Amino acid sequence: MEDVYASKPWLKSYDEHVPPTITNYPQMSCAEAMREAFDGVPDRMALNYMGANISFRDFDTYSNQFAHFLISQGCRAGDVVGLHLLNVPAAFFAAIGIHKAGCVFTGISILLSAEELQYQLNDSGAKVLLTFDFNFETVKKVVGKTKVKTVVVVSIADFLPSIKKVLGTLLKKIPAGEIHSLPNIEVVRFSKAIESRPKDIVNVKVGSDDPCLMMYTGGTTGPPKGAVLTQANVVCHMKQMRTWTGLNNIGEHTIASAFPLFHQAGNFLSLWAIALGASAILLTNPRDLKFMCKAMKKLKPTVLINVPTLYLELMKMREFKALDFSGVQFFVSGASPFPAETIRDFEKIVGQGKVMEVYGMTETTPLITANPMRGMKKVGSVGIPMVGTEVRLVDPATGEPVPLGKPGEIVVKGPQVFKGYHHKPEENANSFRNGWFHTGDVAEMDEDGYFFIVDRLKDMVSVSGFKVFTRVVDDILMEHIDIDMAATIGIPDPKRPGSEIVASAIKLKPGIEKSEAERQKILEYMKERVAPYKVP
């Protein structure tokens, strides 16, 4: 069978400024990649935090001081430091300070339970943990059962404008919590940790193959796993991003992203933005859409990076619709599907062709495919393989390439592909075969090299031997005029052991009443659109 992927049909769809491949990847560490911005635009705003502007000069200084603090705590190159924070200035200073000290960053969701937090701290072997004061009670339950020796406590109020800090405290609008000493563990406020520390650059050398990030993911199977991303993974991916977007000039852009640093998309895109000398609008609470709109109106971002659900909510807001989007170059959408019809509606507000759907994974730093910046964007497609990235679709059973237009598992090679999961040799053996990383995602490719995600392998529903992709069912349901959101799963078929039936949960649009008549109306619609075994 002909391997249609060997000829890389996507190359013909690359923008004119994008070469077929990259041959001159930088040989430097993640911390070294930041120096161009710190040295080149020191007076430019690096972060805007609820009205407080922090320059690249101050960012450089605070992150240097935190790196010195880590070394004072006995941290050495390769030691793991956990960041259990939302997007506040201290999180960014700490993240870059971790890299400057040669340590390994692991992002920890603030939504984790105490048990889940303990698991990640133990699995990663973290020596230092940064957390909020309002999460201290959760942390203290488990931190003594881990290798953590130092807990650095951050407040939402840190680095706020003085007036907002005072008013927020008086009106009790700033989440806070009491902290106290812990047995055999040093507990210190972030402000005290960096106070009086040297401001000069830390002299720590790390190699390209040394670990940079340990980001936790479900992987393709099983419990959360630490995906180890090297310095080269991150730095090479920055080069891929610059080449792909054509954004090369330092200090020209402003980026707004609601992705948290503990999520790999938020983590990498923040590193890329810092290295680009871009100003970042910190969106600490992504649910506060009115604040987001006010910040966008005042600070005029040129790039927005968010999940589809956030864009869906913004679309409903009068304040968002009233904004001037002429200066926004593109809206990146990733981490979950963005229904095609909704993209069309969104672009009626922000401008035709401005949504850039991307696809990736924690294990790939994260991007694998993206729609072109200036070329053809196919609505519903996650785009074409990024420059320097090889992608194939294979039969999960045989590993052989599938024909054009047929669904197959995405496998990938590239400088952004991680080296493996932390202490998980069996999972690594299962995920890497013949040099290709198997993603567990199913897609189709068209004749132009554009990829269309179909589903996760594990999310396929098996109905009497027929394979049903839940995302396909969701997309068709979402096209119904009465449906706002849909989610499809497979549940055991009580009449056929070993088989499943398709079940969908739907949210009706405002004004549509839930009733048996409405249910039957939707069922009839689905019977007209899909095969009988796919009808929920």
Briefly describe each language-model feature range.
Residues 8-15, 32-55:
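AMP-dependent adenylate-forming
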Residues 235-254, 262-303, 317:
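Conserved AMP-binding/adenylation subdomain of ANL enzymes
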Residues 26, 43-82, 86-88, 95-96, ...:
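Conserved AMP-binding/adenylate-forming core of the ANL superfamily
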Residues 72-73, 100-192:
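Structural core segment of the AMP-binding/adenylate-forming
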Residues 301-306, 317-377, 390:
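Gly/Ser/Thr-rich phosphate-binding loop
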Residues 112, 129-131, 414, 419-420, ...:
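AMP-binding/adenylate-forming catalytic core of the ANL superfamily
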Residues 73-75, 197-209, 214-256, 268, ...:
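Conserved adenylate-forming
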Residues 384-388, 400-430, 468:
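Conserved ATP/PPi-binding loop(s) of AMP-dependent carboxylate-activating enzymes
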